[in-house]
Regions:
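N-terminal, polar/charged subdomain of small-to-medium soluble alpha/beta proteins
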Residues: 1-105
Length: 105
């Protein structure tokens, strides 16, 4: 799985990129078949950076979440929480489809 981190309107340190990478890698716990994760840090408002994450799984549309607050890592935690909810909901739908198919047979 590939993780891409980009910034708009400024730069972030390598240490910050490493922390973001470590946090984002945890998304794989929820869904194994991921091709890439794109993280965009928008520093347009210096006091409120915006974090946007696109998760690209195999054979499905992207999961996307964003959040803006005064704390960059707090925003990242909120985004990851939103993504976790989206992925769990998707997995539940897949499981329900499987049950319905087996009941019809």
């Amino acid at each position: 799985m590939q993780i891409n981190i980009s910034t708009r309107h400024g730069d972030i340190s390598d240490a910050t990129k490493e922390k973001i990478t470590q946090k984002v890698e945890k998304v794989q716990r929820f869904f194994e078949r991921l091709t890439s994760i794109d993280v965009t840090v928008d520093l347009g408002k210096a006091d409120e950076p915006k974090i946007e994450v696109h998760v690209r799984p195999e054979k499905r549309d992207d999961f996307v979440a964003s959040y803006q607050s005064g704390d960059m890592f707090g925003s990242l935690d909120q985004v990851l929480s939103k993504l976790e909810q989206q992925i769990k909901k998707h997995k539940e739908k897949l499981q329900e489809r499987g049950k319905n198919v087996s009941e019809d047979v």
